[in-house]
Amino acid sequence: MFERRDDLRLSRKELLKVAEVDEQFLAGLEDAKVISSSRSGHFTTDDLALVKTARELADFGFHAAAFRVFRNAADREADLVRQALSGRRDSDEVGAELAALTARLHGLLLKSSLRD
C-alpha cells in the first residue's frame, strides 16, 4: 500500500473519464489538496484511487471541505512518520512498514471512536 506506484500516467481528461467525475469535482479535490498533477500535468495510480474513493464518499454526502480535513490529518500523520525516520540509515526500508503501522493505528482509533 505504501510502496511508490507511479506505473500509470493519466492526463486530466483521462482521469476524469476513468474516475467518472466531472471537472468541478476534480477541481474541488485539487483545491482541497487531495490530489495534484505532476509537473507534466499527469496523474498517478494513487491519484486515480484517491479520486475514486472521494467520489464514493461524495455519494454519502462528503464534500471538498471534508476531504481537506482528511488531507490535513494525513499530513500530520506523515510528519510524525518522517520525524520517527529522521536520521535513520534504514529509513527507506522501515518507512513503508512504519506508514502501514500508523495506518492500522488510525483505522483502529477510528473504529473505536465510532463505537463509543
Regions flagged by a language model, labelled:
Residues 1-116:
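Arg/Lys-rich, alpha-helical DNA-contact motif
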